[in-house]
Amino acid sequence: MQRIHKVILYYVSLTILYRVTYLFDLEEPWSTLRPYTPYLFILAFGSYLGITLLYNVATTNDKPEAYVDLVKDIKEAQDALRSKGMTIED
């Protein structure tokens, strides 16, 4: 299955699940939150991605092999740009 098919399948599944919740009569605290659930899911997912990204950036120094690979890639990119006539400050 191609990636677009998976994305469409997840989107349709979540939409159906969200719409099915309107078939049930929920108690007061949940019925007031129901219209905002998509935004809450987006907020929670964004928070997860942000925290994961910040954690991985903060712990890069704990992985010396990743640091060496990153420095090597930067040097290769600088050499490639210099070979094309671009001046780069170190």
Swiss-Prot record:
Matches recorded under InterPro entries: DPM3
Predominant place of localization: endoplasmic reticulum
GO cellular component: dolichol-phosphate-mannose synthase complex; endoplasmic reticulum; endoplasmic reticulum membrane
Membrane-topology annotation of the record: Multi-pass membrane protein
Chain segments annotated as coiled-coil in the UniProt record: none
Record's keyword terms, sorted: Endoplasmic reticulum, Membrane, Transmembrane, Transmembrane helix
GO terms (BP aspect): dolichol phosphate mannose biosynthetic process; GPI anchor biosynthetic process; protein glycosylation
Residues spanning the membrane: 7-26, 36-58
Gene Ontology molecular function terms on file: protein-membrane adaptor activity
Compartments (UniProt record): Endoplasmic reticulum membrane
Pfam name, any one: DPM3
Oligomer status and interactors: Composed of three subunits; dpm1, dpm2 and dpm3.
Family of this protein: Belongs to the DPM3 family.
Reported function: Stabilizer subunit of the dolichol-phosphate-mannose synthase complex.
Protein name: Dolichol-phosphate mannosyltransferase subunit 3
